[in-house]
């Protein structure tokens, strides 16, 4: 059994659950892939775990007001990529981590939607300081790992097959997916998050991303794609 044989092609996905810690993470990490999958007819559903209410440096911006703005921005960005359903779980940004019940919530989301792939942020990213990113990525990995164990809290009664996990925002990618014409749409979607990225900040973010994602055939998005086989007691995961 080789690592390659256990690395299904995410571009062949038919149903993808994209789980983001904050309202802008899916677009930043995987916006081009999501747009491409939707154009191919793949069914994509978002799950947004936190309300993003701490994401401001403005002392006059009330958290509740920001949460409302960010929810509207998130739905607009998803819509631009062709995603019509965004499930907002409503956890408080930063304040609710480590979110001990999140694994069970995500097991229910996976059980209901029955995806063949789950997209989320890589909780093993070195030096990741945001607890929401660590908590959400790990909760996704745990939810996939324990999905078919009926006595684990949150396990669905009619558990589907375990989906493959594609981690974005990773330092150890094993797949680099060419963005092609979807690169521009990705950044149009990121631009919908106006509370997070005023024009100057958006220009800087895009320039940095392009400096890190330039391949021989144009820009790409990197992912660590892991079959569930690699999510427990498997040192080969780092090489997968």
Where is each model-derived feature located?
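Active-site rim/loop-helix segments in enzyme catalytic domains that contact anionic ligands
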Residues: 1-113
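Metal-dependent de-N-acetylase/amidase catalytic core
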Residues: 1-19, 96-240
């Amino acid at each position: 059994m080789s690592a390659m044989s256990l690395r299904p092609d995410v571009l062949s996905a038919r149903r993808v659950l994209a789980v983001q810690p904050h309202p802008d993470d899916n677009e930043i990490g995987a916006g081009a892939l999501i747009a491409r999958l939707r154009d191919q007819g793949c069914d994509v559903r978002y799950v947004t775990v936190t309300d993003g209410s701490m994401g401001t440096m403005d002392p006059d911006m009330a958290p509740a007001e920001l949460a409302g703005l960010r929810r509207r921005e998130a739905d607009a960005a998803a819509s631009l990529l062709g995603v019509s359903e965004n499930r907002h779980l409503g956890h408080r940004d930063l304040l609710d981590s480590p979110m001990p019940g999140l694994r069970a919530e995500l097991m229910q989301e996976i059980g209901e939607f029955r995806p063949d792939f789950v997209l989320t942020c890589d909780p093993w990213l070195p030096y990741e300081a945001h607890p929401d990113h660590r908590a959400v990525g790990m909760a996704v990995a745990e939810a996939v790992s324990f999905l078919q164990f009926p006595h684990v809290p949150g396990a669905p009664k009619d558990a589907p097959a375990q989906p493959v996990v594609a981690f974005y925002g990773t330092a150890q990618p094993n797949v680099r997916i060419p963005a092609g014409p979807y690169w521009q749409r990705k950044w149009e979607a990121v631009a919908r998050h106006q509370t997070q990225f005023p024009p100057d900040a958006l220009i800087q973010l895009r320039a940095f991303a392009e400096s890190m994602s330039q391949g021989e055939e144009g820009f790409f998005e990197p992912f660590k794609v892991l079959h569930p086989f690699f999510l427990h007691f498997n040192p080969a995961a780092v090489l997968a």
